[in-house]
Amino acid sequence: MRRAHYHESAVSAAAEAIYQIVRRIPYGCVASYGQVARLAGLPGRARLVGRALAETPAETGTLPWHRVINAQGRISLTGASAREQQKRLRSEGVVIRKGRIDLRAHGWKAGSDSPLLD
């Protein structure tokens, strides 16, 4: 089976679409990888969101990567990265109980007032 190869500009375009959505997630809210993928026009590409966030170039500026979690309301990262994500979320008032974030309380309702961050 042949692996699909993506043209570099297509990957860059997808990553930029992902970054644009992540920039819109409001302070104190979270979104799932799948939600970000759908809103970026990449339905079913949750793993691509994770990969794009892991490979975020420095020139993208401040990107609130910590606001993206899995669909079960859990942090998917491990080790120091997971601790940093928890720290950042808690500093925004996001409550984490038994390793889970209540998506009803903190989930981003896309379409609400969430302007793009510069």
Residue ranges and their predicted role:
Residues R2-D118:
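Nucleic acid-binding interface residues in structured DNA/RNA-binding domains
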